[in-house]
């Protein structure tokens, strides 16, 4: 299983950073791998919430069924994803206070038979760049 992490300083108070990081309706604006939601988004997020989306890494799209397995505002949430071809994804989003703002971080764990071997390494490398770009987009969109 590939594990990738990234974080960025955000000049917003943690509560505001959390509000944006947990707003699924705005993921298309900053999260580069997110393409479109394939299910109706709930009005309230909570543990057990299920949503579906298309994600794309290195030109390879996949439909992912996400389940929120941890939801603790304004600190973080964890989504477990099951995709086509046995792809498994875990997305851990965290917001922590920092002097003059907050730190927003994402950890992504990738696994499943479709991501074994060289393909998995290629996807992991591309996703590492996507995480960095997404975090920078987050700052630009919400604090720029």
From Swiss-Prot:
Q: Which Gene3D superfamilies match?
A: 3.30.530.20
> Cell cycle as a keyword?
no
Q: Give GO BP annotations, semicolon-separated.
A: negative regulation of growth
Segments traversing the membrane: none
Query: Which keywords fit this entry according to its UniProt record?
Result: Toxin-antitoxin system
Please verify whether the record's keywords include Nucleus. Answer: no
InterPro entries registered for this protein in UniProt: Polyketide_cyclase/dehydratase, START-like_dom_sf
Q: What does this protein do?
A: Toxic component of a type II toxin-antitoxin (TA) system. Upon expression in M.smegmatis inhibits colony formation. Its toxic effect is neutralized by coexpression with cognate antitoxin Rv0909. Does not exert its toxic effect via translation.
Instruction: Please report the name of this protein according to its UniProt entry.
Output: Toxin Rv0910
Instruction: Give the species.
Output: Mycobacterium tuberculosis (strain ATCC 25618 / H37Rv)
The uppermost taxa in this organism's lineage are: Bacteria, Bacillati, Actinomycetota, Actinomycetes, Mycobacteriales
């Amino acid at each position: 299983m590939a594990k990738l992490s990234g974080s960025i300083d955000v000049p917003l108070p943690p509560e505001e950073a959390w509000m944006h990081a947990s707003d699924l309706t705005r993921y298309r604006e900053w999260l580069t791998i997110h393409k479109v939601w394939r299910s109706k988004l709930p009005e309230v997020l909570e543990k057990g919430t299920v949503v579906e989306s298309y994600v794309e890494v290195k030109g390879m799209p996949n439909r992912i069924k996400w389940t929120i397995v941890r939801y603790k505002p304004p600190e973080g949430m964890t989504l477990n994803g099951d995709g086509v071809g046995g792809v498994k994804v875990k997305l851990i989003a965290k917001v922590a206070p920092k002097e003059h703002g907050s730190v927003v971080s994402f950890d992504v764990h990738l696994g499943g038979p479709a991501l074994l071997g060289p393909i998995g390494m290629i996807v992991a490398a591309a996703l590492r760049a996507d995480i960095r770009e997404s975090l920078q987009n987050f700052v630009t969109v919400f604090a720029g």
